[in-house]
């Protein structure tokens, strides 16, 4: 876990709790994603690492974001600037998205297969994961021919490796033991 992630967690949690309370989770997620993109701009990064006063930095940042941030979003940026935490915005946005996924009972699953999966195979994998994890699953599919055959699935802390490559590696280890 990076230092910025540790710094970002309480800010992301506070923003998420506020968004839940006000029933504006999607709006806050959009604001944070936009602000994170602005914070990753090389010119803005230079500005944030310079000797600009926090009030001025917040004002400049909010002007750049324009109408993408509502009054509460602008206040959030001011608090981050005053505490010299604007550089944590990308991590804050990422953590906010994780909190939202947990709240919505959603999870992203990375599915790697030896060949491209068709729509039915993707639907079958998604349904099986939803049943096993008791969550709505969004698949991120990729192809890795080195798997030989089968699939490798990673969803949160759960890893399911049904690839031939993995089975061959286990067999090799067993024979060498």
Swiss-Prot record:
Its main location: membrane. Keywords: ATP synthesis, Cell inner membrane, Cell membrane, CF(1), Hydrogen ion transport, Ion transport, Membrane, Transport. InterPro entries: ATP_synth_OSCP/delta_N_sf (IPR026015), ATPase_OSCP/d_CS (IPR020781), ATPase_OSCP/dsu (IPR000711). It is a peripheral membrane protein. F-type ATPases have 2 components, F(1) - the catalytic core - and F(0) - the membrane proton channel. F(1) has five subunits: alpha(3), beta(3), gamma(1), delta(1), epsilon(1). F(0) has three main subunits: a(1), b(2) and c(10-14). The alpha and beta chains form an alternating ring which encloses part of the gamma chain. F(1) is attached to F(0) by a central stalk formed by the gamma and epsilon chains, while a peripheral stalk is formed by the delta and b chains. F(1)F(0) ATP synthase produces ATP from ADP in the presence of a proton or sodium gradient. F-type ATPases consist of two structural domains, F(1) containing the extramembraneous catalytic core and F(0) containing the membrane proton channel, linked together by a central stalk and a peripheral stalk. During catalysis, ATP synthesis in the catalytic domain of F(1) is coupled via a rotary mechanism of the central stalk subunits to proton translocation. Belongs to the ATPase delta chain family. PANTHER family: ATP SYNTHASE DELTA CHAIN. This is ATP synthase subunit delta. It comes from Pseudoalteromonas atlantica (strain T6c / ATCC BAA-1087). The lineage of its organism: Bacteria, Pseudomonadati, Pseudomonadota, Gammaproteobacteria, Alteromonadales. The gene is atpH.
């Amino acid at each position: 876990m990076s230092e910025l992630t540790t710094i970002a967690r309480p800010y992301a949690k506070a923003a998420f709790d506020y968004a839940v309370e006000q029933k504006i989770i999607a709006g806050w997620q959009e604001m944070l994603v936009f602000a994170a993109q602005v914070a990753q701009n090389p010119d803005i990064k230079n500005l944030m690492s310079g000797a600009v006063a926090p009030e001025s930095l917040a004002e400049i940042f909010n002007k750049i974001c324009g109408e993408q941030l509502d009054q509460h979003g602008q206040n959030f940026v001011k608090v981050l600037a005053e505490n010299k935490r604007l550089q944590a915005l990308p991590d804050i946005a990422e953590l906010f998205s994780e909190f939202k996924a947990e709240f919505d009972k959603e999870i992203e699953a990375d599915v790697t297969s030896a060949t491209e999966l068709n729509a039915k195979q993707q639907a079958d994998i998604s349904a099986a994961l939803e049943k096993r994890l008791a969550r709505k699953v969004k698949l991120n599919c990729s192809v890795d021919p080195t798997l030989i055959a089968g699939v490798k699935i990673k969803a949160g802390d759960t890893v399911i490796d049904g690839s031939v490559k993995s089975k061959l590696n286990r067999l090799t280890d067993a024979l060498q033991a």
